[in-house]
Amino acid sequence: MGRFFPYADIPAIIDNMKANKDSTSYNNTFLYPKDGAGSFIQILYDSLNHSKVLLGHKVVKIDNENKTAELDDGSKITYGYLINTSPLNHFLDYFEGKEFKNLQEALSYNKVLVFNLGFNKKSKYTEEHWMYIPDKKVNFYRIGFYDNILDADKLSMYIEIGYGKNDVITDADVETQLKLTLENLHKLGIIDDETKLEEHSTIIMDPAYVHINTETEKRIQEFKEREAGNNIYTIGRYGAWTYCSMEDCMIAAKNLAEKLNAE
């Protein structure tokens, strides 16, 4: 996990709690596309033969011996190489065999209910980009301020609420959590009596944050090495089941493309 969980001794931890100009992190500075991260996808798509791009379908089964993928309309596609970037726990669903099911069940992760909220006015917090809320009495653990990042004139933010991997998040749960969220934002002083919710949307991240341990990491590596022999590769933050940045994912994809092109 490298820089995401760097080694730190007690003095370093205490020092990082202070207003210290020398305190830095792996993402202290960064470059970001002017038109958003979607511009990467658009550039790649524009360079492809669009007749070979199939959208609006879902893979439901993979035959790794005969190198075929079955789609949700019953059609089958023969492949030379198969590169997966979808979450590994979902990807394992496409294979038949107890070993795939066992690995799937062993994977640990959480789900996150995300609210995107738009209000009629700014908050008193005008410089913060995100905050962690270490309070069990509050239903969310992290919030972020889109408006402060974009220098907008109305409060817009995201809220993250954690769940276990086996938890079922119903519509009723979403409504309850939205009500609690607004109450807690008010209690924390982030919104006031004059602040009104104008727009909101909901996203359920499943999985959200993967949990890495020695045993499952070993089994994942064995799966990846075995399936590489069948020309199947699984990469990306969720496909490789790891912690990484967008840059890491892009480099991994570039390295794999160069490797396969050289074969």
Model-predicted regions and their roles:
Residues 1-67, 85:
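Active-site/ligand-binding neighborhood in enzyme catalytic cores
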Residues 54-56, 198-201, 233:
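General small-molecule cofactor/ligand-binding pocket signal
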Residues 57-175, 180-190, 217-226:
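Mid-domain catalytic core of redox enzymes
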Residues 112, 192-204:
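A short coil-to-beta-strand element that immediately follows conserved catalytic motifs
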Residues 158, 223-242:
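Short FAD-binding loop at a beta-strand-to-alpha-helix junction that anchors the flavin cofactor
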Residues 204, 261-263:
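Active-site-proximal substrate-binding core of FAD-dependent oxidoreductases
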Residues 208-219:
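Charged, often glycine-rich, active-site loop that binds/positions anionic groups
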Residues 238-260:
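A conserved FAD-binding loop/helix module that cradles the flavin
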